[in-house]
Amino acid sequence: MNIRKPLCSNSVVGACTLISLTTAVILGHLMLRELMLLPQDLHESSSGLWKTYRPHHQEGYKPGPLHIQEQTEQPKEAPTQCDVPPSSRFDCAPDKGISQEQCEARGCCYVPAGQVLKEPQIGQPWCFFPPSYPSYRLENLSSTESGYTATLTRTSPTFFPKDVLTLQLEVLMETDSRLHFKIKDPASKRYEVPLETPRVLSQAPSPLYSVEFSEEPFGVIVRRKLGGRVLLNTTVAPLFFADQFLQLSTSLPSQHITGLGEHLSPLMLSTDWARITLWNRDTPPSQGTNLYGSHPFYLALEDGGLAHGVFLLNSNAMDVILQPSPALTWRSTGGILDVYVFLGPEPKSVVQQYLDVVGYPFMPPYWGLGFHLCRWGYSSTAIVRQVVENMTRTHFPLDVQWNDLDYMDARRDFTFNQDSFADFPDMVRELHQDGRRYMMIVDPAISSAGPAGSYRPYDEGLRRGVFITNETGQPLIGKVWPGTTAFPDFTNPETLDWWQDMVSEFHAQVPFDGMWLDMNEPSNFVRGSQQGCPNNELENPPYVPGVVGGILQAATICASSHQFLSTHYNLHNLYGLTEAIASSRALVKTRGTRPFVISRSTFSGHGRYAGHWTGDVRSSWEHLAYSVPDILQFNLLGVPLVGADICGFIGDTSEELCVRWTQLGAFYPFMRNHNDLNSVPQEPYRFSETAQQAMRKAFALRYALLPYLYTLFHRAHVRGDTVARPLFLEFPEDPSTWSVDRQLLWGPALLITPVLEPGKTEVTGYFPKGTWYNMQMVSVDSLGTLPSPSSASSFRSAVQSKGQWLTLEAPLDTINVHLREGYIIPLQGPSLTTTESRKQPMALAVALTASGEADGELFWDDGESLAVLERGAYTLVTFSAKNNTIVNKLVRVTKEGAELQLREVTVLGVATAPTQVLSNGIPVSNFTYSPDNKSLAIPVSLLMGELFQISWS
């Protein structure tokens, strides 16, 4: 063995003294930088849902006062095995900057490394673990009906307080493609995430994986049986399990990693010493910061197009470190290590397997897929009515009108301004009469400012004990938009009933259709509370992840505050999810139809109850481009109903930016234009006629494609598919697709290539191998009531790709959308609302392969009823093309689907002009064939709910 002495042996002590002094200065600077407060942190700004509670600490535990003196670390011998490749060094000083002497006293190696860093990089560690660093030892391994159990023991404590020296390992081989293992304290109940997950009592019969264990140092090694590739190897660094610091590291089989949302980043994450922090935070998106949601799940692509995923079911504040070796380290501040490994083997299957655990997405109402419009500053019903009238007059679709805080009385939930919104209920009823819906903002914080008896939500909440409490048992009081506020505890069953009552009572006054949940990280304009926070170990843990503001209570409530299930320290990242669950439940019980909830804060499993918008994005080309990986990321995380504020929220947009953003936004699963009070208005009708024409064209295309989009949501709901998806999900064997995040697919069939830079009239995109047909060849304008301006420029009818980057014409009025060979998609005549568009005739676009084949399907129901699958109240029709013939198959037909009229079929890829076209055996005389585009347009008069056959020869 090649043994190296630690740096600064006696022979070079003089030089090393100088190095140590320099290092101390640098580390001091870095420590200040890590704890630096942002300006907004330095002042105040104007049911059976859960498993059994398991508290974080032992029964009866209360957090004690913080002892300010530094934790005494038992000095260890300086290591002699420090010849570790730089990319494989694991940080031995994650908690603070330390000197060489302190590092070596921990038994670790110290080698300075000069680097220039850019967020989210943290840099190569100077103090790192030697291979011989003590960890846990595996003992008493035994087989069980579902896997294995073992005891893990540590003989020497670490440098974190309250080590748990004896642990229990439970390994569950749950399915052939899912492995589940837990590491926890057998002697003390600790907090576990109360997420409803599958319980499996038997061992998988034919797993795709093998599991191995390293005895000392302890580790779990997971391999693919086919090929033997190591997917998980936790022996690469020591395991830590202290009361408030848990660390688990693993090697990675490749550097192609995605997931770990929510962050402003490319689709593929950097493994160049990147730190990803998960602690939900109200802050405008910027690189290297913790944002509104936490999803501790990653998907890794492997050579050959295989993929696997790993999910750490832990809701505590955490960092995830990615390093070049490649390797990943989880660092959590509490809970247990509850790990799922998904074997795929293809990326699509990994996502489905993850959703098998956290839940499949909810099925949105059809109207929710239309266009939504909002602005902070619609300050009266007169203004809202004028906006709606302007949208109609200028022929822009509008399905859902929204209001921000403006509608409220003193910015309090479940109230409305009796002056500027005096006829609020009438306004909402008028929207309904015109076939539209209405949504408004609801913040979780409840005003506590008024005298007793003046505000029912607070009075009732106090009486029923629904608020989060401080160390004295009284409601914790913070400050949000209405002034002083209390925060509902949505883990309390009583709170769910209280919230439902408040929603129902307000709905009886104002018949709104959905709820927009904002500020639910939860956000707080003071740190912790009006009275501050206790000085205890939950507020000042021994390890603080890289959160904005440097402390957990920054811009939120005290970590040590009390909730029904545990402390906020454990439950903070679940706050948005629990409010979404409560709101979805309240809407179902109040309205009796499918709920529609959009929430800013999210956690794993959120898509089961609600959608998401990406927060306070800026009106910039940079944020336009970042919205593509944002939307793709949330689809991989099981939240397909997602979108960014079209044209941007913060700052003034430009005409060109708003046109390009509207074109891309037409392909967000959730399409909303919304902006800030202090920014210029940006409704579509505000711009020049040229810009309006370009936007109308994008609107018309989206509304024409809604039947296909709705079918994709059905597949997401029943199968765990994505709606918007990255190219690698469909083409995993093509490595060129892996990092593509300036394009997106809708399902398997539509490829969208937006313009994301100013001043461009062409765009470059990657086209996987095959034929891609330009959707400009498919027109359904004549079927609807919404005219779509035709493009003034010529276009390329089809792309024949060998798997290559291609440059396409993209004038201002055009977003390139291509239909993939082998697919049939349903379309419908577009109108100003989905209420009207659902009444229009339908069409099929058929994209033939070289062998003349294609397939597709249509899912249809009434668009808003509950339990349509359970009641069989839906229509499902499949389509197939082969041998110059298109036929349908009726899987199930109900009244609504039976009445759908099919009026137009466009067949793409017809090599030669036909001489005869038949519809159910009857000749069609007025078909048209384009020899230039190789397209065949067939007018028909058929019903989707009846068998048909269309052929040409």
From Swiss-Prot:
SUPFAM superfamilies, alphabetized: (Trans)glycosidases, Galactose mutarotase-like, Glycosyl hydrolase domain
Pfam family name, one: Gal_mutarotas_2
MF terms in GO: alpha-1,4-glucosidase activity; carbohydrate binding; glucan 1,6-alpha-glucosidase activity
Active-site residue list: 518, 521
Keywords, in A-Z order: Disulfide bond, Glycoprotein, Glycosidase, Hydrolase, Lysosome, Membrane, Signal
S-S bonds: 82-109, 92-108, 103-127, 533-558, 647-658
Glycosylation (residues): 140, 233, 390, 470, 883, 926, 933
UniProt-listed Enzyme Commission number(s): 3.2.1.20
Annotated compartments: Lysosome; Lysosome membrane
Maturation propeptide residues: 28-69
Residue numbers binding substrate: 404, 600, 616, 674
Signal peptide: 1-27
Gene Ontology annotations for the cellular component aspect, listed alphabetically: autolysosome lumen; lysosomal membrane; lysosome; membrane
Database matches in PROSITE patterns: GLYCOSYL_HYDROL_F31_1, GLYCOSYL_HYDROL_F31_2, P_TREFOIL_1, P_TREFOIL_2
The keyword Signal is assigned to this record: yes
P-type domain segment(s): 80-131
Coiled coil: none
InterPro entries the UniProt entry points to: Gal_mutarotase_sf_dom, Glyco_hydro_31_AS, Glyco_hydro_31_C, Glyco_hydro_31_CS, Glyco_hydro_31_N_dom, Glyco_hydro_31_TIM, Glyco_hydro_b, Glycoside_hydrolase_SF
The keyword Hydrolase is assigned to this record: yes
Biological process (GO), any one: lysosome organization
Annotated catalysed reactions: Hydrolysis of terminal, non-reducing (1->4)-linked alpha-D-glucose residues with release of alpha-D-glucose
Family: Belongs to the glycosyl hydrolase 31 family.
Chain's role: Essential for the degradation of glycogen in lysosomes. Has highest activity on alpha-1,4-linked glycosidic linkages, but can also hydrolyze alpha-1,6-linked glucans.
PANTHER family: ALPHA-GLUCOSIDASE (PTHR22762), LYSOSOMAL ALPHA-GLUCOSIDASE (PTHR22762:SF92)
Designated name of the protein: Lysosomal alpha-glucosidase
Organism of origin: Mus musculus
